């Protein structure tokens, strides 16, 4: 197989093998910096070839000192290459024989331009008394707070020793504290399983925790703890047991969940032993717990078995969505799995429409040469990938035939990486002895992998739970087209509906027409979408209002989008606000841009055409 390099790294990871990473860091809340020392156990990755040159990824780092086996070693930091950052070149005084390992140590500090870290002032937190910092490394931001081979192709076991005046969380099992000094402690963590750089995480702030299962705790600010406990304790262990039944025994010892401040840019981030999640999950009625199923599924798909590069991101996210819905199906019935897939298909259609049917970013296998992986981020790898697996399952003979492949797959590639070629080979390896190779042959692999746009096959989903949503949406749409009086609609229309059904209703009416303003007002009044604590509902309704240019809600929408950093909600709202009232959109962004994480702010700037 021809060697394929990850275009999103400048490191020479095919030449340099890293077997262990030991990271010491001190958090400086006053200067909003991190001072670090990272040590790698390295050796040549080439058989019988000495190691003479080491290249690591960095971005906005101040490199202070480099040693190899404690001997000072010259280094050079290249000029920045845009989103790729600045390559760090290290040339040992003497070549390192292929049979010998050594310890490479780098002393450094982050800078104000660090894209992985967000420091929060006390007033930006729930408690309002202490500062806070958290990281977000996916896709290629780890290089901005630690020099590394910043590619998912490289996975290493790690130890973390982090000094802070506030409690710390990192991507490993806590091993205690040590060395109290000047009001701060060292917090120790160990990650025995090899992990890629995008799963490195750090968080420090005013934290409290409580158990939400026999192997799970939730961490958050004290003022939010009881709400988080209620939201997750009912489902956590049930999800873990269902996931293990589908895959392999959980190998990470503990699955802990961290609810972050509202500026966190994603729904969740599957950091091992410390899943980071948005507070928008806290709806008060456990209606967003499917995100737990998704992040938990990453323990196998993504964390245990990792996409080789961001060009085949679907192998992380598509498989994870597929597992997430399998878990929900096991616990709540197959119609629930099918219903979630219907919502996902609608989100995929919206993404393809936004990106363009011929866009490179609508392919399963994407060419990211010269492209920032953050720009490629959409629901495509999630939903197109999941639907591809759904189609393979259908072709091969259904769940009873396909599901036994899952533990085989995760066992085969455990603690390693996978690409689309290896994935396909694994399918043939498993199903050919069962006489099912011809079934796999019937799949149009090239179209699924490389064609842009919607999938070549649309699944036939069970619409039992969706039909009432379609019926009510049709009634609203027809009434609006006929200019009927909307007073006939009442809260009883959606009585006993799940949050998912309400979401689907809003998705369908959003795609149908731009509603008259009296219809938007009536919908808001009788269904209380704008006031909903479930952000999935309120932001869907806000999209509908903006599409219909319903100005009475503009200020409410601006306030809400300025209090939530989750890009799933923020970016669509700003795009629609830009279409409805560009001046107001820019004014709103300028008002709140320092609230957002840099990843989010950067993407919104591009959406609004404000970036250089």
Curated annotation (Swiss-Prot):
Pfam families: Leuk-A4-hydro_C, Peptidase_M1, Peptidase_M1_N. Its EC number is 3.4.11.-, 3.3.2.10. SMART domains: Leuk-A4-hydro_C. Its cofactor is Zn(2+). Keywords: Cytoplasm, Hydrolase, Metal-binding, Metalloprotease, Nucleus, Protease, Zinc. Disulfide bonds: none annotated. It is found in: Cytoplasm; Nucleus. One of its GO terms (cellular component) is fungal-type vacuole lumen. The keyword Acetylation does not apply. One of its GO terms (biological process) is peptide catabolic process. Binds 1 zinc ion per subunit. The active site is at 295 (proton acceptor), 382 (proton donor). GO terms for molecular function: aminopeptidase activity; epoxide hydrolase activity; metalloaminopeptidase activity; zinc ion binding. It catalyses: an epoxide + H2O = an ethanediol. Belongs to the peptidase M1 family. This is Leucine aminopeptidase 2. It comes from Schizosaccharomyces pombe (strain 972 / ATCC 24843) (Fission yeast). The gene is lap2.
């Amino acid at each position: 197989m021809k060697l394929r390099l990850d275009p999103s790294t400048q490191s020479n990871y095919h030449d340099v093998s890293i077997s262990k990473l030991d990271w010491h860091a001190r958090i400086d809340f006053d200067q909003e910096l991190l001072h670090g020392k990272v040590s790698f156990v390295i050796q040549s990755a080439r058989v019988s070839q000495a190691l003479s040159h080491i290249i690591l990824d960095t971005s906005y780092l101040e490199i202070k000192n480099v040693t190899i086996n404690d001997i000072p070693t010259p280094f050079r930091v290249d000029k920045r290459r845009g989103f790729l950052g600045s390559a760090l070149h290290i040339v040992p005084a003497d070549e390192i024989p292929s049979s010998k390992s050594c310890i490479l140590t780098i002393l450094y500090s982050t800078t104000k331009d660090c894209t992985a870290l967000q420091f929060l002032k006390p007033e930006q937190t729930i408690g309002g008394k202490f500062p806070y910092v958290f990281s977000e490394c996916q896709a290629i931001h780890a290089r901005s707070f630690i020099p590394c081979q910043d590619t998912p192709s490289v996975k290493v076991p790690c130890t973390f020793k982090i000094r802070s005046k506030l409690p710390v969380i990192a991507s490993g099992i806590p091993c205690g504290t040590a060395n109290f000094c000047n009001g701060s402690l060292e917090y120790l963590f160990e990650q025995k399983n090899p992990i890629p750089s995008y799963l490195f995480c750090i968080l420090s702030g005013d934290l409290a925790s409580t158990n939400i299962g026999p192997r799970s705790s939730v961490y958050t600010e004290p003022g939010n703890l009881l709400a988080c406990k209620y939201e997750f304790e009912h489902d956590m262990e049930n999800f873990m047991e269902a996931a293990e039944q589908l895959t392999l025994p959980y190998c990470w010892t503990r699955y802990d969940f961290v609810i972050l401040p509202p500026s966190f840019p994603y729904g969740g981030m599957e950091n091992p032993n410390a899943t980071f999640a948005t507070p928008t999950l806290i709806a008060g009625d456990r209606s967003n717990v499917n995100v737990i199923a998704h992040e938990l599924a990453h323990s196998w798909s993504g964390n245990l078995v990792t996409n080789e590069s961001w060009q085949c991101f679907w192998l992380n996210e598509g498989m994870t969505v597929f597992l997430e819905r399998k878990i929900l199906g096991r616990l709540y019935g197959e119609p629930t799995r099918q219903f979630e897939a219907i919502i996902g298909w609608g989100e995929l259609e919206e993404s393809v429409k936004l990106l363009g049917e011929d866009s490179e970013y609508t392919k399963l296998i994407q060419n990211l040469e010269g492209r920032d992986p953050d720009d490629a981020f959409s629901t495509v790898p999630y939903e197109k990938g999941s639907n591809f697996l759904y189609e393979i399952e259908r072709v091969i003979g259904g769940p009873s035939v396909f599901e036994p492949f899952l533990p085989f797959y995760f066992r085969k590639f455990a603690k390693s990486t996978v690409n689309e070629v290896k994935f396909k080979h694994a399918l043939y390896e498993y199903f050919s002895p069962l006489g099912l190779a011809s079934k796999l042959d019937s799949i149009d692999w090239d179209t699924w992998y490389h064609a842009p746009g919607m999938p070549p096959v649309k699944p036939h989903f069970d619409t039992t739970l969706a039909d009432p949503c379609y019926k009510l949406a049709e009634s609203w749409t027809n009434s609006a087209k006929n200019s009927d009086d909307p007073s006939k609609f009442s809260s009883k229309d959606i009585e006993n509906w799940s949050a998912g059904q309400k979401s689907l209703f809003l998705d369908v009416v959003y795609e149908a027409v731009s509603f008259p303003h009296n219809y938007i007002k009536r919908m808001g009044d009788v269904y209380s979408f704008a006031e909903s604590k479930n952000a999935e509902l309120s932001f869907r309704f806000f999209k509908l209002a903006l599409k219909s240019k319903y100005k009475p809600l503009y200020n409410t929408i601006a306030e809400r989008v300025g209090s939530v950093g989750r890009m799933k909600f923020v970016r669509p709202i700003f795009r629609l606000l830009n279409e409805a009232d560009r001046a107001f959109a820019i004014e709103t962004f300028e008002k709140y841009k320092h609230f957002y994480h840099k990843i989010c702010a950067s993407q919104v700037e591009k959406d609004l055409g404000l970036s250089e």
